[in-house]
């Protein structure tokens, strides 16, 4: 992780750049070897009608539909299975959980509809939740800020494209199963590629003073999940095509705003709340198919919230959380999600007509709380401290002239201090291989062949 909170703003010399140049700079901060940590498909948002398609083949148990019980098992599994993880064996443990998860999914598919299949589905959901915990850990601790943004965006785009696909190629009641199968396939493949060395920097990590930064990000993450969970229990949109297409428009708007606003996530958070508030109000004021159709256009803002929430969560976890605290974070935010399954689920069963009103009040209430927390969140998450030292400014100007990425700039700072690769890795919370990769790139861009030449180049200035 970088020393600074995040690259929410550009360097002064970059502010006049075009959108194309900004997108190009993002590309240079992506490392192909990290794709396995970027694809958090086990945490992908659900699409309208997915839940209904799964319920169609579900066998109720204890008076509840199996999908409701599987949702509870999923939330429990995220924190429960990761609680036994240790840094020494985390990659091997993740592979084993992924293997058992895949087997249980296949078992759930082949068993005839009945109590046994429902039980297999609950076991699968528990293990799938465990995989989500590992994927969130890799997402937060092995990636830089840009990779997290792109990873969350790809995961959201996966959901939107699948939604458009089933709108154009109807799969009937099987669309939910196929979506879950794709999640399982990608997640299992990514988890089998995890490498323990990418998490070595967590071992001796200090977490002093983490609370002020962690709390606002956890609030926004929980708020996003609460709003989306309530909306998922409303009757589905009459047009998946319109919902999917509008979601793609919002997705494109999300990325453009992020880049045009100089890499600030703040605007995405505000637009998520505003968009979802409008969505619930439309469902409340127009309780018919026309209201559902109108709401499906603005419902795409939920994807903006997904990207922003996981970006911020990954940011604060990667910088301020060690393994022990990460387990507590999982227990708090995902086990608390049990209420987000139970409350709207029971409400949908006992008083479905009250769901739009309760969802609207919940969204507006969380929006008000978010507004009240703006000063704290602005100070802790959205403002990068100004650089004051002249030597620092000179270093940044040279890095800009040579076209260094943010990570390469950080590695160079460590190298010219005389640090070894191992010390650089500990300082930046990345692996030694990653340090070597960025150091060689910096040598090439600066047209030097050794650390001595690099030090002379910067220190002479």
Positions of predicted regions on the chain:
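Hydrophobic core of transmembrane alpha-helices in multi-pass small-molecule transporters
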Residues: 116-133, 291-306
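Linker/hinge segments immediately adjacent to helix-turn-helix/homeobox DNA-binding domains
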Residues: 3, 13, 41-53, 105-106, ...
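The N-cap/first-turn positions of alpha helices
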Residues: 406-411
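Glycine-rich segments within core transmembrane alpha-helices of 12-TM secondary carriers
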Residues: 146-168, 327-344
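Cytoplasmic helix-loop-helix junction between adjacent transmembrane helices
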Residues: 128-152
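Recognition helix of helix-turn-helix DNA-binding domains
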Residues: 418-453
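Central cavity-lining transmembrane alpha-helices of secondary-active solute carriers
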Residues: 65-85, 248-256
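Conserved MFS/SLC helix-loop-helix module at the cytosolic interface between two early adjacent transmembrane helices
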Residues: 80-96
